Amino acid sequence: VNKLNFYDIDKEFFLSDELYEIIKIALDVSDKTNGVYDITVGSLVNNLGFGPNLFLDNQYVFESYSLKFSIDDKNKSISKYKDVVFDLSSVAKGYAVDAISDYLLANNFNNYLIDIGGEIAANGSSKNGVWTIGIQDPQSLQQNVSFTVTNSSKFIGVATSGDYLNFKYLDGELVSHSIDPRITKSKDNNVLSVTVLDESSVSRADAFATAFNIMSLDESVELSESLGIKVKIIYISDGLIKYFESKSWQNMNYE
């Protein structure tokens, strides 16, 4: 990714198979969220101190990625039109979990749980039965569990996005690592934590969890219901902790 970020404008950059797949997943989620999920926010992330001290002078503009770069599916390459800075941290961990899961299944390992930075794949069963995954209470300093999900002996991908583990104070103001590209700064909503379940892709769950963490609750409700996404959102309303569960989440047998 660093090579891509440093690469010249208007020159074709050839992607590895893995990087191509990651970017294609990300762009699909970007399309479905009207650009709220944006992998070109790298300069904003860096300027807020959540990334390296690179590309700090790059000016971010919220606009369609088609105005920033193009991807050639035949050659698996990218050509940048502008000095965009890619940040794939919101999908790369999920992709790594998927890759390990695929490897295990290909080698006939059918009972496993994989966890990379909170992005999880579970399949089959543990020695004690189904896998039970605890989702942290976003307001608990002791990492207490807010709720649990199980895989019911099937494959599930679980991704959780929140700001309770990655934030800082700048000039006395709480700053989140979750960037809303529409306002070019940390998100401004009442969402504390988002958990997405996907029955085939941790990568996709990872990206959508990030998007729902950035969007307003109303936006997330509308989008998750229209796409049939299994999502549970913890949020604050009138000073109280509340939960939203999409219809797809309510209808599953994993909780």
Task: Annotate each predicted stretch with a short phrase.
Residues V1-E255:
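Mature catalytic core of soluble alpha/beta enzymes
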